[in-house]
């Protein structure tokens, strides 16, 4: 759980089921008003921070006060899945406070509220998605469950990218002879036979 005095959570770190969320975001789009059977007005707004975007559902009069470009701090919010999409809510006791306008670094991608067929499939079948495990083999860094594999998980940092010239960087791991190089393979789990042909 997150307390009111905790630093804001990034949108990329929001997961379904989290409560007492503190998030700072900029409003990118305000959806049209829909009315519930009880007579409440609901607006879905697309909001973002520097790590991505998400949809927030805002109820009643507060939704009418929000404008595109507003920078808002949500306190005591929660996240849930609605129609297979991750959605942020203010909830009971939650607050939206305008703290600025327009000047905030943000990214619209990834959109964490895009429909997630994996989640919908899990709900319908009640089983875990095994494809994530298959795709995460032979890779370094975070995998689907947040665990790390490879040298990074043992406290070594492997730089990725290019030095002066083509080819991958060959990092020197502690405890390995200097004449021996370690090749780092970065895989995006795509079949190389289906590569783009020019």
From Swiss-Prot:
Biased amino acid composition, Polar residues: 136-151, 173-188
Region (Disordered): 114-198
Domain of life: Eukaryota
Tissue: Ubiquitous with high expression in the thymus.
Subcellular location per the Swiss-Prot or TrEMBL entry: Nucleus
Keyword flag DNA damage: yes
Any Gene Ontology biological process: double-strand break repair via homologous recombination
Subunit structure: Component of the SOSS complex, composed of SOSS-B (SOSS-B1/NABP2 or SOSS-B2/NABP1), SOSS-A/INTS3 and SOSS-C/INIP. SOSS complexes containing SOSS-B1/NABP2 are more abundant than complexes containing SOSS-B2/NABP1.
Main function: Component of the SOSS complex, a multiprotein complex that functions downstream of the MRN complex to promote DNA repair and G2/M checkpoint. In the SOSS complex, acts as a sensor of single-stranded DNA that binds to single-stranded DNA, in particular to polypyrimidines. The SOSS complex associates with DNA lesions and influences diverse endpoints in the cellular DNA damage response including cell-cycle checkpoint activation, recombinational repair and maintenance of genomic stability.
Protein name per Swiss-Prot or TrEMBL: SOSS complex subunit B2
């Amino acid at each position: 759980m997150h307390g009111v005095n905790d630093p804001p959570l990034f949108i990329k770190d929001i997961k379904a089921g989290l409560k007492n969320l503190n998030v700072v975001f900029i409003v990118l789009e305000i959806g049209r008003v829909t009315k519930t059977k009880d007579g409440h007005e609901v607006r879905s707004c697309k909001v973002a921070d520097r790590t991505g975007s998400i949809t927030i559902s805002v109820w009643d009069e507060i939704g009418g006060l929000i404008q595109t470009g507003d920078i808002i701090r949500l306190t005591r919010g929660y996240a849930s899945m609605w129609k297979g999409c991750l959605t942020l809510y203010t909830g009971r006791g939650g607050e939206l406070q305008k703290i600025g306008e327009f000047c905030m670094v943000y990214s619209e991608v990834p959109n964490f509220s895009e429909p997630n067929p994996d989640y919908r499939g899990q709900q319908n079948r009640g089983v875990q998605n095994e494809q994530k495990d298959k795709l995460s083999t032979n890779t370094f860094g975070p995998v689907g469950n947040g665990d790390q594999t490879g040298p990074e998980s043992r406290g070594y940092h492997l730089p990725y990218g290019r030095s002066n010239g083509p080819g991958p960087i060959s990092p020197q791991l502690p405890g390995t002879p200097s004449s021996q190089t370690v090749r780092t393979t970065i895989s995006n789990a795509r079949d190389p036979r289906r590569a783009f042909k020019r």
